[in-house]
Amino acid sequence: MSVGLDLGTSEFRSLRDSGESLIARRCRTSYLVVRDTPGHRRLLASTQARHGTCGDDLVIFGDDASECASMLDLSVVPLLRDGRLPQGDPVARQILALMVEAILPAAESGSPICCLTVPGGYGLDADTQSLDVRFLKQLVALRGYTPQVISSGMAMVLAELAGSSFSGLGISLGAMNCEFSVVHCGRELARCTIAGRLGEICDEFLSSQNSSRAAENSDLLRASWERNCTRILTGILTEARESLISEGSIRLIQQPMSIACAGGITQSEGFDQLFQKAWGQSGWPVRVGQTRIAANPGFAIARGGLIKAILEGQATPERRAA
């Protein structure tokens, strides 16, 4: 039962192979804490909200937290502020464990591989992994899996570029950070992480669409958002290019290069054109063959993780050790 696990800033997602079908689960990374009272218990029972207990409180998490918060006139709390795990907050860590349990069922037998991606900005190499990454791996191990961490960019190449022999540039445009991976035949040659805060751009667009001025100024609002989005995308792509050039990684890219890209912002109407414009302005010194924007960006990274887990599960022990 191989599993791909995408631990993103705004949402956790899993995709597992049961042997007969693929099973997807997701959980938003927000929560609500209320007192453990009979009234709140009845509310949770009537809504069938996912929750746990913490001392004298009830912790509601995921989409259920938003629904209950609306009923109680309260506000949900984001778990991963700035894309980072909460520090010095054992309650928040317990909530994080509950969220992982909600989307990652206990392994039925053996120790199947779970390939996971973590919020951007953390070192992923075994000798530089932070305590936060090790904590996330421990949560996966407690569910009975053998955890393996991969980058979101690597997952994108595996998910989208099978037709290019799993070679190209994988881009994950996250809410807080953007990850880029140079991959050749399924092997990651280089990667970099760029702070992007694209989640704010998505929120800005949704807010403008829902505003009272949206109907009468829709064209102006759209044009303004597109300019802002293109400017920020160009900056991110330029910074990634400079980072990979400074490392000498650009010369490792096979040309013409294939690109695989996913992220919440890619669901915006007309994103393909905005990306192509930003790419042209960012000055990458490579020829591009194809650009694939994930058709299902929500689970693209989890799917790449699942593919990696299946491949690793088929490998010999000697190869995995290498």
Show the residue positions of the predicted features.
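Nucleotide/phosphate-binding catalytic cleft detector across ATP-hydrolyzing
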Residues: 1-25, 29-50, 63-170, 185-199, ...
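A structural feature that tracks compact, well-ordered secondary-structure segments
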Residues: 179-181
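Long, charge-dense
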Residues: 198-210
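Long, charge-rich alpha-helical interaction segments
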Residues: 213-220
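Conserved blade-ending motifs and adjacent loop-strand segments that build the rim/top face
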Residues: 295-298
